[in-house]
């Protein structure tokens, strides 16, 4: 039976979906069968990031509304034979947590991992995704605004009593950590009271000015 992991964040623009895709590719590369379910209904972009948007014939909405079976809606990632994407689509009615869980539970026996890309924040879409998961990865950046929202997410996740919750700190600039301009990933994990699973560096050399507020208040 698959491990069901929700990848979430308190704030948009922190790289959550990109990290979900990269995680899926890494797991698939070691031989695991992985499906990434885009739970950001109506604002889905996991298929775009994976480069399969033109290959999507059916999506999560179609499965829930009975137009196809779950396996028919999966699109294979072009870089891996073991990694599949389930796009969310735009449903004609509100998708309930129970309906989404039914779909993902149906897929779980065929896969080693079910990754659930949650909408940012703690709205209804977040709760729908969290209700389907057994584990969570919270993605944040060192920006103070991102940390504040990640704190809200971790607080709410505790109410779900998941088996495991871990943190990924994205867009980290080591020079600013060394200079004391921003909190280190370890300090961030301690503040949020959640184990640190991974650190990803800032790739483009651009770091928003608000980041320097993370340590100074």
Please annotate each region the language model reported.
Residues 108-125:
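Glycine-rich phosphate-binding loop used to anchor ATP phosphates in small-molecule kinases
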């Amino acid at each position: 039976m698959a491990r069901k992991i929700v990848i979430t964040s308190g704030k948009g623009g922190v790289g959550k979906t990109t990290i979900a895709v990269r995680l899926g590719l890494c797991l698939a590369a070691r031989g695991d069968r992985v499906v990434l379910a885009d739970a950001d209904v109506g604002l889905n972009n996991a298929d775009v990031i994976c480069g399969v948007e033109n290959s999507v014939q059916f999506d999560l909405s179609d499965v829930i509304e009975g137009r196809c079976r779950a396996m028919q809606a999966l699109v294979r990632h072009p870089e891996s034979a073991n990694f599949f994407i389930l796009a969310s689509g735009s449903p004609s009615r509100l998708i309930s947590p129970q309906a989404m869980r039914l779909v993902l539970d149906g897929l779980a026996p065929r896969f080693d991992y079910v990754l659930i890309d949650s909408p940012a924040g703690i709205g209804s879409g977040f709760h729908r995704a969290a209700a389907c998961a057994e584990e969570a990865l919270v993605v944040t950046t060192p920006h103070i605004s991102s940390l504040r929202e990640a704190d809200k997410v971790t607080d709410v996740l505790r109410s779900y009593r998941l088996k495991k919750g871990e943190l990924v700190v994205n867009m980290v600039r080591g020079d600013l950590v060394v200079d004391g301009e921003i909190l280190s990933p370890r300090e961030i994990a301690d503040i949020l009271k959640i184990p640190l699973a991974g650190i990803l560096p800032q790739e483009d050399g651009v770091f928003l000015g608000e980041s320097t507020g993370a340590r100074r208040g």
